[in-house]
Design a protein with these regions (language model features):
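N-terminal secretory signal peptides and thylakoid transit peptides that target proteins
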Residues: 1-14
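Boundary at the C-terminal end of the N-terminal hydrophobic targeting segment
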Residues: 18-20
Length: 160
């Protein structure tokens, strides 16, 4: 085995917690989350508020990288899945597999599909069937529910 192959193996092992390994649920009370997060992020993530459109700098983010949950830091979307939907919220064609959970939302007259971080339960946004091909999905996210990590930066450790 060459040294380069050995190093690649170590890199793969350390990458497992973010991608591919079993995701362990992070349970915190609303009071604990309120102490950890800015009020605007807490309101969206754990009270299911919606931020105003065109207010998040992440709506215009075009660099390569990963969008992570602002609460627990689980990677949720790759920048390659981001597109400009014209809605004023960061939008994606698909999430990272296994990192998002969905449920029906009946808060408005028309039922919608809400999605949240599978690890901490933080509300992210809603998925609609008006996105670009091939999937036709628009994962419409509240920017305050996400943080962006540029491709040349390491992902933070998952919050405990």
């Amino acid at each position: 085995m060459v040294r380069r192959d050995l190093l690649r193996g170590f890199v793969a092992v350390f990458a497992l917690p973010a991608f591919g390994a079993e995701i362990v649920e992070l349970k915190k009370s609303k009071e604990e989350w309120r102490k950890l997060l800015p009020e605007s992020a807490y309101g969206v993530l754990f009270e299911e508020h919606t931020e105003r459109p065109f207010t998040s700098p992440l709506n215009d983010e075009k660099h390569k990288g990963t969008f992570i949950c602002a609460a627990c830091f689980l990677p949720l979307f790759e920048s390659s899945a981001k597109f400009d939907s014209g809605t004023g919220w960061p939008s994606f064609t698909q999430p990272i597999e296994g990192h998002i959970a969905t449920k029906r939302d009946f808060a408005l007259i028309i039922p919608r599909t809400e999605y949240h971080c599978v690890r901490c339960g933080g509300h992210q946004g809603h998925v609609f069937e008006d996105g670009p091909k091939p999937r036709g999905e628009r994962w419409c996210n509240n920017g305050v529910s996400l943080q962006f990590v540029a491709a040349d930066k390491p992902l933070p450790e998952l919050r405990s």
